[in-house]
Amino acid sequence: MGALRPDSGTCTVLGADSAAPEFLSLKEDIGVVLDEAYFPESLNALQVGGVMAKTYRRWDGKQYQNYLTRFGLPEKKPFKDFSRGMKMKLAIAVALSHSPRLLVLDEATAGLDPIVRDEVLEIFNEFTREEDHSILISSHILSDLEKLCDYIAFLHQGRLLFCDEKDRLLEEYGIFVGTADQVNSLQDGA
């Protein structure tokens, strides 16, 4: 969000060039969940909500409280004593409680147990049911991508190798698991 400058190329987010000064005003419209949740360890969930209420103009304390209840998060337990799953749920509650239009998820479900991951994926699906809501997700968990995404892009060493509709990829391509010799013996176009 302005901390890094691209070496080349451009990035447009919600219609604004990421290098343009007006891009900073979009921070209210973007919710971010990283692979690790970063909140002051001494704060509890209620205190985190208080800080966020001063950070975001559109902070919805009632919505935040609803997520805390839905996730079964303790309101007065210090963040440092949260499990990984609890930390991720708190980060998701924060990201969703200021009415973002775009969620940016960086390995947000990695390391979560399957039950928690399914619960989180359902919340992300609920989010995208709103027409003006989108998710940009970075994940190594292919089943998460299959459940959430309409389009799949593959980046390698900072380059976009392909971007296509998920359904087209599922229809036209498959996954082959084999030894190096088996892969080398495949015919071209197989």
Per-range role (PLM):
Residues 114-116:
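Helix N-cap at the start of a conserved alpha-helix in ABC-type nucleotide-binding domains
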Residues 28, 32-90:
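ABC-family P-loop ATPase nucleotide-binding domains
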Residues 9-17, 25-26:
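Conserved ABC transporter NBD signature motif
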Residues 1:
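Helix-to-loop junction immediately C-terminal to a conserved catalytic motif
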Residues 163-164:
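ABC ATPase "signature
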